[in-house]
Each structure stands twice: as C-alpha cells, then as structure tokens.
Amino acid sequence: MTPPRALPPVWGRRAAGASALWGLILASCSLPSLLRRATEGPAGAPDPLFVLGGAAVPLVAGLAIASWAARPRPWPGLRGVLGLGGLRRSAALLPCGFFAGLAASVPMAGLFLLAQALLDPLGFAPEPQPAVAWLMDPATPPAAVAAIALAAIVLAPLAEEILYRAMLFGGLAAQGRPVRAALLSSLFFAALHLSVAAVLPLFALALLLCALWRRWGLAASFGAHAGFNAANVAVALLFS
C-alpha cells in the first residue's frame, strides 16, 4: 500500500493553517446554538435540507483547500495529498476501515464514561451533541432523522478527514515531526467539537484516524470515522 504523498514543508504549513482557520470558523458558528441550547433547552427539529447543506459546506471547503495545496497538478496532486489510491484499493479499504471504526466505538464509549465520571464531581453535566439529541427525540420527523444520519455517517466524516487528517495532520507532519503533528491535530479536532466530556474519546479516536490515514490514506480513515459515527447513530436511535 502506498502512503499519502507528503506535502512540501511550505505547502504543508499553508494547508495546516487554512484547515485550522476553517475549523475555528466552524466552531465559532456552532457555539451560539450550543449556548442557546444550554440556556433555553432543545430547539425544534431541524430542516433536512439545512442539515445536509450545513454538512456539505465543510466538505466543499476541505476539497477547495486540498485542491489549492495540490497545485499545480489539481487531480493527480489532489489524489496524492489526500492519499487516494485506485478504485480497487479504496473499495477494499473502506469496509475494513468501517469495521475498525465500529470496533473502536466500544473503547471510546468507555473513555467517554470515564471522562464523565471524572467530570461529575466538578459539576459538569455533559449535554449531548445537538445531532444526537435530535436522533434521540421521538418527535424528530423521519426525513430529519435520515438527513442527520446521512450527514453524520457520510458527509461530516469525509469533510473532517480531508480537513483534519489530510490537510491539518498531513500539513503538520510535512514539517518532519509526525508524532507531534498527530497530537496537535487530534487535540484540535477534539476541542472543536465543543464537548468537555467528549474530548478524551475524540482525542483517542483522532489519533487512530491519523495512524490509519498516514498508513493507508483517506479511504481507511474515512471508513473508520464513518463506522464510529454509524455506531453512535445506531445507539442514539436505539434509545430514542
């Protein structure tokens, strides 16, 4: 298996900086809704088109940043930067990554419970992410449930793997210190989800995704991320 092509150091810095800036923009856009939810309680069910559109924006931005970093050879360079192999290779890696993500959801759930137990004495009452809360609400219409599931399992993982693994981790790793790149990008990824109780499991998940992306490319890390999110969607629907 051919690993992703390393970005030149100067492009690595630019790609990492652009991805970090975009991640901060996304987090700042979602912060008001999280604060409103914490003070006013859950809002009504979202519009399905709004959910899909909101998930598509980071994906388009990630592809734009990756295409910019891959210049002057947009398609061959983009494949190399993202770590995309041939169709057969991707078709084989996707299901392997998916089942790895499903399996990883078990220890990650344990880390979440551990973090929650440590935070409870400090007065932290972790709120579920808005998407999880909507999935667990029996009043959420089926169309909204389907849109949230599609965004959570396909669109969001693909966007985040491009932004945080290929661009941020890959860009930082191009400076020659992949371990530091994995730690920094994983901490950034976990923090931007704006959930104190989820920082520990998401940090561990991100480290796993960095390792998968560095060794096998985008198909493996995206498959694992999709599998992890699919397990969370299934659990949320089970308890709805």
Predicted regions and their residues:
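Membrane interface segments of multi-pass transport proteins and intramembrane proteases
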Residues: 40-43, 119-126, 171-179
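Hydrophobic alpha-helical segments embedded in or immediately adjacent to the lipid bilayer
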Residues: 99, 103-123, 150, 159, ...
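Membrane-interface interhelical connector segments
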Residues: 116-142
